């Protein structure tokens, strides 16, 4: 059982670091380059969420104590972050590609989506760290 745990944890950490790191960077740069990173970010988000759910199954099955409640808050924040990036950022990027939106307005929406997601992913990271010691 250790090999699946190690592989899942590694995939979770790598995808989460890319997702959060790129979100923090795009939030800081005003979303500049967001259209190029949208698909990789959403791919990393899917992998992070799926591996996180599987880790919950492997490590926390049958228990819902304080640590699991903290992890649930973090998981919810990650889901909302993915939704914000997908809905707000994705629509803005799609309108840029179609040429149907004001470029400044679309870039502003991308930046806002990344800033909201960055805060939510910071909450997620804090929850993962705190759950370890709960």
Identify the role of each PLM range.
Residues 1-134:
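Polytopic transmembrane helical bundles with strong interfacial aromatic enrichment
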